[in-house]
């Protein structure tokens, strides 16, 4: 039985095959939440993703006996490497069958490509930026995933350890039960912080206003707030424009909490949305012909679960209780 590794050409058809493999691998798994196929294709396309302005990347597919058996993308983020003074290769968008030969061939190919590009270390799974799926699940395989998080089979970590990879950091996902009413202590803290720093919550009535008035500032706040986080890749102006157009038109205004100062400048934001997990599972990540109906129902209807996508607080306001205002 032979394994072959094929470099991916960034054409629509080959990218679709690449994305589809990652979804088909989990077709019998009830906890896996597929990405939106079109978004994933655009993320991997140099013509669509402005991250390629600052990144080099090469994607590969593994085939065993002529059948798709694995996929992986090698990424060099020049901004991160320059900022951290490292020669680091990232790997991401990785999936594979439970087969030593396939996994070894995939990672050897990526490592060899990295060496030809002058890289000295390898780390992952990471994306082009922190807007991409990152990390590898090592616990909680019986929990349904979210649109923003990674899900993978338990055997993944075993293969990584077998090849000599070691865990660098833990990312933890929490499930929080929302109380029926805000605790008095929490409400008092929010009021104290609001008065002390002259802050206020912005009533959001129009997605258009959010995009035009706050869109750029929101992602620049994320750049500031996340600058010291593990593996963070600051977004360029073109990336910010891209994400403003891609995401802010889809938000539910009642799921966004935005805090501004006396100059109407954003100092903190929290963005959540009704869980799209079940809608994505039903649609298998496809909008057409009927997938959009499942997603629209999930987005517009009542949901027992809300996914908290991000919270960002301006550095000078961190550790000062501003989170109480966001969640109040």
Q: What is each residue range found by the language model?
A:
Residues 3, 150-230:
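Acyltransferase donor/substrate-recognition loop-hinge adjacent to the catalytic core
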Residues 17, 102-105, 151, 155, ...:
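Generic recognition of stable, solvent-exposed alpha-helical segments in well-folded globular domains
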Residues 83-164, 286-328:
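Acyl-donor binding region in acyl/amide transferases
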Residues 120-127, 168-175, 258:
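A structural signal for short, well-ordered beta-strand segments and their strand-loop junctions
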């Amino acid at each position: 039985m032979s394994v072959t590794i094929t470099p991916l050409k960034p054409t629509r058809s080959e990218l679709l095959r690449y994305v589809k493999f990652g979804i088909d691998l989990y077709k019998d798994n009830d906890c896996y939440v597929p990405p939106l196929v079109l978004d994933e294709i655009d993320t991997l396309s140099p013509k669509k993703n402005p991250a390629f302005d600052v990144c080099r990347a090469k994607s590969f597919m593994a085939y065993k006996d002529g059948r798709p058996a694995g996929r992986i993308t090698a990424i060099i983020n020049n901004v991160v490497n320059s900022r951290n003074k490292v020669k680091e290769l990232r790997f991401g968008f990785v999936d594979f069958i439970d087969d030593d030969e396939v996994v070894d061939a995939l990672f050897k190919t990526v490592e060899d490509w990295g060496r030809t590009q002058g890289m000295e270390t390898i780390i992952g799974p990471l994306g082009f930026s922190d807007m991409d799926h990152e990390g590898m699940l090592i616990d909680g395989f019986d929990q349904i995933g979210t649109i923003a998080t990674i899900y993978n089979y338990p055997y993944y970590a075993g293969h990584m350890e077998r090849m000599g990879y070691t865990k660098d950091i833990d990312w933890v996902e929490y499930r929080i039960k929302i109380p029926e009413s805000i605790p008095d202590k929490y409400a008092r803290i929010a009021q104290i912080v609001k008065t002390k720093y002259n802050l206020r919550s912005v009533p959001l009535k129009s997605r258009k206003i959010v995009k035009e008035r706050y869109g750029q500032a929101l992602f620049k706040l994320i750049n500031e707030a996340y600058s010291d986080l593990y593996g963070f890749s600051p977004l360029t102006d073109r990336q910010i424009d891209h994400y403003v157009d891609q995401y802010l038109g889809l938000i539910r205004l009642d799921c966004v909490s935005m805090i501004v100062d006396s100059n109407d400048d954003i100092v903190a934001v929290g963005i959540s949305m009704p869980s799209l997990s079940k809608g994505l599972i039903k649609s298998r990540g496809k909008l057409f012909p009927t997938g959009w109906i499942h997603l629209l129902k999930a987005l517009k209807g009542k949901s027992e679960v809300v996914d908290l996508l991000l919270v960002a607080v301006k550095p000078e306001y961190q550790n000062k209780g501003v989170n109480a205002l966001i969640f109040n």
